[in-house]
Amino acid sequence: MKRFFLVWGLVIVLLLSGCGSSASRVETLKSWSFQYNEGTSDYSLFFGLADKNGKPLSADVDVDIRIVNDANEEVYAGTKSVSTDDFGYYTSQAAGEQYLANVRIPAAEIKAGKSASGKVYFTVYKENAVQFDEVNCDALYCLPIEDVQVTFDSFPLDLKVKDFMGSTASVIQIQGAEFKFDKDYSPQLTITITGEKKSGSSDSGYDMISYKLYDSAGYLVDSGNIYLSSLSAGDKFKDDSVVIYDITPGESYTFQLSEYSW
């Protein structure tokens, strides 16, 4: 009876030692990628491990991760411990089904920066068992970006609209302005102005005013004209036709309106 228990004890020890040393059997790091998970508001760093024969396996490993955006800002640095429970089968259209580790990073742990794209650098290792060189993958249009600030003129602001002869054809009063910063994919800024036509007729077809957008250093970023169609005296309007695409996250802008010059 003692021999029976001794044999089974040795079997259990061997099985446990085999599970615990799985990191030492790892020979290959492969199939890494990075994505944002909209449903859970976090990020996933995927990678696969394989033995010397290319057979996928799981292992308890540590992962040093740092994320640097395209503005050369380090927005994340940390170490995650990965267990065999973090491995599973994942399917993609490009690679089919793969056995991968899913290392999750909460969105709140990644700082907002000046670019939504960048690189994810990571090193997979386990002390006294396995050590891989640092590798990287792309983070495309998924990193958090900073808000922008826009300063407007003091309102109300009366702007004269001149005709070809230089005479005042109408007066447009700007009563307010606001902005919307869209962070999805390519950042863009939408400016909405509200106001009233104080004088003039609708015979000209449209009233035209000009705008300019400056950055915090005083450089002109964008300029153009706003066309207000078929307004009669006393008509109120709301215009959101100004959409600017060349926007830097985290920047402070000044938006100025002026009379159009022929």
Please name every model-derived segment.
Residues N53-D60, K111-G113, K198-Y206:
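A short beta-turn/strand-edge loop motif at beta-sheet boundaries
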Residues V61-V63, S170, G205-I209, E251-Y253:
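Short beta-strand/loop motifs in extracellular/secreted proteins, especially
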Residues I65-N69, Y211-D215:
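Conserved aromatic beta-strand anchor motif in extracellular beta-sandwich/beta-rich domains
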Residues L15-G18:
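C-terminal motif of bacterial Sec signal peptides marking the signal peptidase cleavage site
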Residues E74-P144, S216-W262:
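Short, solvent-exposed, Trp/other aromatic-anchored flexible loops in extracytoplasmic proteins
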Residues Y36-A50, S58-D60, L100-N102, Y185-T192:
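Contiguous beta-strand segments within globular domains
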Residues M1-F4:
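Positively charged n-region of N-terminal signal peptides that target proteins for export
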Residues S21-D42, A139-Q188:
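Transition segment at domain starts
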